[in-house]
Amino acid sequence: MNLEVIAQPIVLGLIVASGPLVIVSLAARRGNL
């Protein structure tokens, strides 16, 4: 098993999961929540 084949889905998953978290954290810092 190639590491690239395993790493690509993990990286994509982290990017998709971190997207909303970054937006929420930025909104929390601005006091919009």
Curated annotation (Swiss-Prot):
Family: Belongs to the Psb30/Ycf12 family.
Native organism: Aneura mirabilis
UniProt topology in membrane: Single-pass membrane protein
Keyword Hydrolase: no
NCBIfam families, alphabetized: PRK13686.1 (NF010239)
Subunit structure: PSII is composed of 1 copy each of membrane proteins PsbA, PsbB, PsbC, PsbD, PsbE, PsbF, PsbH, PsbI, PsbJ, PsbK, PsbL, PsbM, PsbT, PsbX, PsbY, PsbZ, Psb30/Ycf12, peripheral proteins of the oxygen-evolving complex and a large number of cofactors. It forms dimeric complexes.
GO cellular component, one term: thylakoid membrane
Compartment list: Plastid membrane
Family matches, as InterPro entries: PSII_Ycf12_core-subunit
Protein name as annotated: Photosystem II reaction center protein Psb30
Domain of life assignment: Eukaryota
Principal subcellular localisation of the protein: plastid
Sequence intervals crossing the membrane: 5-25
